[in-house]
Amino acid sequence: MERLATRLLDAARVPRGIVDGPGAARPGRRDVSSASLRFCRYAPETGDDAGEAPWSTCRPHADAAWLALAPIGDVPGLAFYDAARGAWVEPERGREGSLLVWTGLMLEAHDPAYKAAVHMVRRADRERVSAPLLLRGAPDSPDMRAVWKALQADDAAGARASLLADRELVS
């Protein structure tokens, strides 16, 4: 997975200095990373859920990460918004055992040509378990702190300006 992530970030021309590495999450700690491997459990749909919104506990959102990767399991439910079609698409159906990769808000802030993937998890008739890996930036670099603050304020333009402020890191 590391080689795949490195190739994807290199293809997007993301500077290595602002990507998380050993010891990036906490100064002096080489055993901690700000990348996040999440284990998510989604309860199955019940009759009581019929009138509720189509998502489970995961409403439509984009991830605060450079990239996200997740193995595709046997219970589909992940849906991505396709702005060109104005519709939700479900790329997991029929692709069990594959790996799904999508773009995050940090990549969009770095280069607006890459749009963060808006996604949600739809309800299923069975329990769904997922394990997404979120590849995040090195939070101790000054530019990344500003990027995080801008992303939390839903300000993509401010996040991009923060990335571009440090000319040594962004080419």
Language-model segments: residues:
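Catalytic core of Fe(II)/2-oxoglutarate
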Residues: 55, 72-171
